[in-house]
Amino acid sequence: MALLKKINTQVNRIMKNSSLVQNICFDRVPLFIPRLSLTVKYCLAVKLLIYLLYCWYIYSEVPSASSKFRSFTFGCVVVYHNKFFPRFIRTHSINSIRTFSKFQVIILFSIEKVTRSESKNHSYSKTDISDLHQGYNNPPSRFISR
């Protein structure tokens, strides 16, 4: 975990020095947009990997956490980076995905929720992992109790 924190700090430092990153609303600019420099693309990819590793750490090292909470946490980590996904992924509605597994439903529900809440304030400067857990402690039971 200490190594992940060091890498995250270095990535944040590089991204802070990029004026382009500060002026982009990532909800509308996927990772593959050519305006982003190669360095910034690598930084964003590394940050995504860091969050996924952090979540894997929670999943494997905290046996007392329920599987529902761990799955939901992983969904939130993936969803936190939904700004890098193609637009069509974010526009799927929950009602049209009945054939998906519970885990995918949770992820897509989170994508809808995060996209709605983040589109109001457009503040993407906070990258602390604790931001991922705000508002997700009580997931709707209809999506995970089946």
Swiss-Prot record:
Keywords: Cytoplasm, Membrane, Nucleus, Transmembrane, Transmembrane helix. It comes from the Eukaryota. It holds the Pfam family Pombe_5TM. It is found in: Cytoplasm; Nucleus membrane. It is a single-pass membrane protein. The chain crosses the membrane at residues 38-60. Its main location: cytoplasm. InterPro entries: 5TM-prot_SCHPO. Signal peptide: none annotated. GO terms for cellular component: cytoplasm; endomembrane system; nuclear membrane. Belongs to the UPF0742 family. This is UPF0742 protein SPAC977.02. It comes from Schizosaccharomyces pombe (strain 972 / ATCC 24843).
